[in-house]
Amino acid sequence: MSDILDEIVIEDVVANCPQEFLQYHKCIRDNEENPGKCKDGRMILSTCIREKVPSVKSIMSECSEPMKKYDQCIRDNMGTRTINENCLGFLQDLRKCAELQVKNKNIKPSINGVNLELIKD
Protein backbone atom coordinates (compact mmCIF):
# COMPACT_ATOMS: atom_id res chain seq x y z
CA MET A 1 0.00 0.00 0.00
CA SER A 2 2.96 2.36 0.55
CA ASP A 3 3.62 2.80 -3.17
CA ILE A 4 -0.09 3.30 -3.78
CA LEU A 5 -0.24 5.86 -0.97
CA ASP A 6 2.67 7.78 -2.50
CA GLU A 7 1.05 7.68 -5.92
CA ILE A 8 -2.32 8.87 -4.62
CA VAL A 9 -0.80 11.75 -2.68
CA ILE A 10 1.43 12.83 -5.58
CA GLU A 11 -1.47 12.68 -8.03
CA ASP A 12 -3.58 14.64 -5.57
CA VAL A 13 -0.85 17.30 -5.29
CA VAL A 14 -0.47 17.55 -9.06
CA ALA A 15 -4.25 17.75 -9.51
CA ASN A 16 -4.78 20.45 -6.90
CA CYS A 17 -1.54 22.46 -7.10
CA PRO A 18 -0.44 22.01 -10.73
CA GLN A 19 1.22 25.40 -11.29
CA GLU A 20 3.01 25.39 -7.95
CA PHE A 21 4.19 21.81 -8.49
CA LEU A 22 5.52 22.50 -12.00
CA GLN A 23 7.20 25.78 -11.05
CA TYR A 24 8.97 24.22 -8.08
CA HIS A 25 10.21 21.19 -10.02
CA LYS A 26 11.32 23.36 -12.93
CA CYS A 27 13.30 25.47 -10.46
CA ILE A 28 14.92 22.36 -8.94
CA ARG A 29 15.81 21.05 -12.41
CA ASP A 30 17.27 24.41 -13.44
CA ASN A 31 19.22 24.84 -10.19
CA GLU A 32 20.61 21.37 -9.50
CA GLU A 33 23.83 22.84 -8.12
CA ASN A 34 22.00 25.18 -5.75
CA PRO A 35 18.46 23.98 -4.94
CA GLY A 36 18.37 26.56 -2.14
CA LYS A 37 17.39 29.06 -4.84
CA CYS A 38 14.00 27.32 -4.92
CA LYS A 39 13.12 28.04 -1.29
CA ASP A 40 10.29 30.44 -2.21
CA GLY A 41 8.80 27.93 -4.65
CA ARG A 42 8.99 25.21 -2.01
CA MET A 43 7.14 27.41 0.48
CA ILE A 44 4.45 28.28 -2.09
CA LEU A 45 4.00 24.59 -2.98
CA SER A 46 3.89 23.59 0.70
CA THR A 47 1.19 26.17 1.43
CA CYS A 48 -0.87 25.01 -1.54
CA ILE A 49 -0.54 21.37 -0.46
CA ARG A 50 -1.64 22.11 3.11
CA GLU A 51 -4.61 24.20 1.96
CA LYS A 52 -5.88 22.44 -1.16
CA VAL A 53 -4.86 18.76 -1.26
CA PRO A 54 -7.61 16.56 0.27
CA SER A 55 -5.42 13.54 1.01
CA VAL A 56 -2.79 15.65 2.77
CA LYS A 57 -5.40 17.63 4.71
CA SER A 58 -6.92 14.39 5.97
CA ILE A 59 -3.55 12.90 6.88
CA MET A 60 -2.44 16.06 8.69
CA SER A 61 -5.70 16.21 10.61
CA GLU A 62 -6.02 12.55 11.55
CA CYS A 63 -2.35 11.60 11.90
CA SER A 64 -1.04 14.57 13.86
CA GLU A 65 0.17 12.45 16.79
CA PRO A 66 2.38 10.03 14.79
CA MET A 67 3.54 13.00 12.70
CA LYS A 68 4.64 14.90 15.83
CA LYS A 69 6.49 11.84 17.17
CA TYR A 70 8.31 11.33 13.86
CA ASP A 71 9.22 15.04 13.61
CA GLN A 72 10.52 15.03 17.18
CA CYS A 73 12.59 11.91 16.52
CA ILE A 74 14.17 13.57 13.48
CA ARG A 75 15.02 16.67 15.52
CA ASP A 76 16.40 14.58 18.38
CA ASN A 77 18.64 12.54 16.08
CA MET A 78 19.64 15.13 13.47
CA GLY A 79 23.17 15.55 14.76
CA THR A 80 23.88 11.88 15.40
CA ARG A 81 23.21 10.40 11.96
CA THR A 82 20.95 7.80 13.55
CA ILE A 83 17.66 8.99 12.07
CA ASN A 84 17.14 5.82 10.03
CA GLU A 85 17.80 3.52 12.97
CA ASN A 86 15.93 5.47 15.62
CA CYS A 87 13.03 6.93 13.65
CA LEU A 88 12.03 4.13 11.29
CA GLY A 89 9.34 2.85 13.67
CA PHE A 90 7.82 6.34 13.94
CA LEU A 91 7.85 6.68 10.16
CA GLN A 92 6.15 3.30 9.78
CA ASP A 93 3.45 4.34 12.28
CA LEU A 94 2.89 7.58 10.37
CA ARG A 95 2.63 5.76 7.03
CA LYS A 96 0.17 3.23 8.49
CA CYS A 97 -2.01 6.07 9.74
CA ALA A 98 -1.79 7.85 6.38
CA GLU A 99 -2.66 4.66 4.51
CA LEU A 100 -5.73 4.21 6.71
CA GLN A 101 -6.86 7.76 5.93
CA VAL A 102 -6.60 7.22 2.20
CA LYS A 103 -8.14 3.75 2.37
CA ASN A 104 -10.96 4.43 4.87
CA LYS A 105 -12.00 7.70 3.29
CA ASN A 106 -11.58 6.25 -0.20
CA ILE A 107 -9.56 9.30 -1.20
CA LYS A 108 -8.76 9.44 -4.86
CA PRO A 109 -7.16 12.29 -6.78
CA SER A 110 -9.74 14.76 -8.07
CA ILE A 111 -10.05 18.23 -9.51
CA ASN A 112 -13.11 20.22 -8.51
CA GLY A 113 -14.82 17.02 -7.40
CA VAL A 114 -14.13 15.12 -10.64
CA ASN A 115 -12.41 11.80 -9.88
CA LEU A 116 -9.25 11.58 -11.99
CA GLU A 117 -9.41 7.79 -12.00
CA LEU A 118 -12.55 8.08 -14.11
CA ILE A 119 -10.63 10.13 -16.66
CA LYS A 120 -7.75 7.63 -16.92
CA ASP A 121 -9.93 4.79 -18.21
Swiss-Prot record:
GO terms, biological process: aerobic respiration; cellular respiration
Motif range (Cx9C motif 4): 87-97
GO CC, any one term: mitochondrial intermembrane space
Paired cysteines (S-S): C17-C48, C27-C38, C63-C97, C73-C87
Iron-sulfur found in the keyword field: no
Motif window: Cx9C motif 1: 17-27
Presence of the UniProt keyword Repeat in the record: yes
Primary localisation category: mitochondrion
Motif (Cx9C motif 2): 38-48
UniProt xrefs under Pfam families: CX9C
Ranges for domain CHCH: 14-56, 60-105
Subcellular locations according to the entry: Mitochondrion intermembrane space
Keywords noted in UniProt: Disulfide bond, Mitochondrion, Repeat
Motif (Cx9C motif 3): 63-73
Official protein name in the record: Mitochondrial intermembrane space cysteine motif-containing protein MIX14
Upper classification of the organism: Eukaryota, Fungi, Dikarya, Ascomycota, Saccharomycotina
